[in-house]
């Protein structure tokens, strides 16, 4: 007979079931209403007002790209069809215009470290907002930034925000495990870096099990 440690085991089992159910429900709704991608799109005029572009430049770029077979996002408004340009569409317009990206102008990554030992000071909200804003803000799109969020908090709140399917239950491919196993870049890309709903923003998840790394540190690294 298993011990339930004063009801803790039963509570944990129920919580795990509820979290899986909630995650599955969210995913089913997104599939049902075709909301599997990032929601934000831009009109052609909105793109024309972005840095280093103009109405003439955007119209010319779209014309050239469509003539070459490129397909832009569109939406139906009454009897007319209007451009609904995705983040990738805008990035491709900049590339067609030969606007240099951040990585063309700078060597290596730019690191932002968000940390506080105190809880409830908006570490997660700040991190996720920075990641989304630096990728998707109209004034930043010409940089075509590739964002990687490395979640080192065992609560996995940032992972939940960015990729809820990787935040429930025991997750083996976490940032803490990557450090413990001293993996190379190829292994990290293939096994640990997970895509999020926003193209260009990826995450290395955290898991509740990471909370035990500190207490087992000596045994793990011996």
Q: Where are each of the predicted segments found?
A:
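Short coil turns linking two alpha-helices in DNA-binding domains
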Residues: 52-61
């Amino acid at each position: 007979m298993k011990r339930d440690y004063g009801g803790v085991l039963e509570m944990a089992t129920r919580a795990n079931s509820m979290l899986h159910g909630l995650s599955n429900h969210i995913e089913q709704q997104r599939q049902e209403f075709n909301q599997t991608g990032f929601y934000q799109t831009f009109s052609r005029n909105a793109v024309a007002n972005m840095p280093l572009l103009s109405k003439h430049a955007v119209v010319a770029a779209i014309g050239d790209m469509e003539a070459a077979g490129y397909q832009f996002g569109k939406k139906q408004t009454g009897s007319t069809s209007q451009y609904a340009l995705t983040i990738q569409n805008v990035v491709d317009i900049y590339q067609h215009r030969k606007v240099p990206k951040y990585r063309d102008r700078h060597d290596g990554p730019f690191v932002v470290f968000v940390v506080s030992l105190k809880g409830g000071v908006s570490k997660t909200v700040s991190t996720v907002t920075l990641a989304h804003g630096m990728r998707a803000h109209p004034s930043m799109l010409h940089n075509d930034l590739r964002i990687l969020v490395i979640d080192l908090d065992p609560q996995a709140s940032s992972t939940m925000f960015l990729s809820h399917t990787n935040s429930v239950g025991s997750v083996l491919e976490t940032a803490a495990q990557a450090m413990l196993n001293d993996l190379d870049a190829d292994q990290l890309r293939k096994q640990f870096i997970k895509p999020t709903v926003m193209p260009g923003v990826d995450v290395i998840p955290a898991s509740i099990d990471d909370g035990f790394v500190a207490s087992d540190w000596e045994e793990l690294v011996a």
